[in-house]
Amino acid sequence: MNQACVHNDTIDAGNHHGRPQYRSFLRFLTTQERSVIWLLLGIAFLPVDGTTLGLYAPFWSPISPALFAAYCLCNWRQLRIAANRYLPMFLLPVACIILSIPGWLKFGIHLNAAFMSITGLLGVLVTLGAIAIAVGIQCIPWRTPLRILIASYWFSFGVGVVQWLAIHLHIKPLTDYFAHLMYRQYINESSVWGGGHLQFLFAEPSYIGMHLFGVLLPLMWLMRGRDRIYAKRLRNLIVVYAIGAVLMQAGTRIVLRANLPES
């Protein structure tokens, strides 16, 4: 870890202990480049991947990749460094296109599907590129982004509770609102995928497992040796989210799948 990273981490630790959260956030913003706001927005919108506000992709409509792309474009010089450092990762779209050519020659190419597949791969690259720039090159202090991430997932859980209450108390204005907000809605009776299921802000209820075990759980393991406070906060979030999802009958099969015998 270079001296800049150590300095930023020391500042962030000072902000974390004994200061009001809003002052820590303002101090963080004043010590970073303006482009960091795109990174923070991308992190904040990670749990929002199924609304009509996002970019359409097969089976989901995320917002964060576009925000991470804006962050990468604002830091294009650092993006070149990250691309050179992680060249195999950035050659992934080229490799996928080459591997797809035999199938296109034999069965034909569907331009719309090919376009969405390529943009999906680019979304992966800008997300990983944003992380590489922020953590590996700019050495942005990690506590503030992590606080935002935890808060955004708690917010999405709260949205799920509101959806559950709206469904079970038959609050039609709320169910209609969420039905219009979600790209593939599972909320009300007009859903072609079956109504009466909350989905938080995810594309579908089964995505709960992806977020819990693909985003939050790895972060918790990374935090165990770095900051016990944040590891505990992430653990509490995962436990409450998983138990809450099961009790509200959303994504139960996905949450419990690892513990269920094959039928």
Q: Where is each model-derived feature located?
A:
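Membrane-embedded alpha-helical segments of multi-pass membrane proteins
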Residues: 56-75, 118-129, 208-216, 254-262
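Juxtamembrane membrane-water interface segments that cap and precede transmembrane helices
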Residues: 43-51, 184-201
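Alpha-helical transmembrane segments of multi-pass inner-membrane proteins
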Residues: 146-173, 192-194, 200-249, 253-262
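Structural signal for the C-terminal ends of transmembrane alpha-helices
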Residues: 48, 69-81, 130-142, 219-227, ...
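Membrane-interface helix-loop-helix junctions at transmembrane boundaries of multi-pass membrane enzymes
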Residues: 27-32, 73-90, 222-236
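Interfacial loop-to-transmembrane-helix boundary motif in multi-pass membrane proteins
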Residues: 32-35, 88-93, 131-176
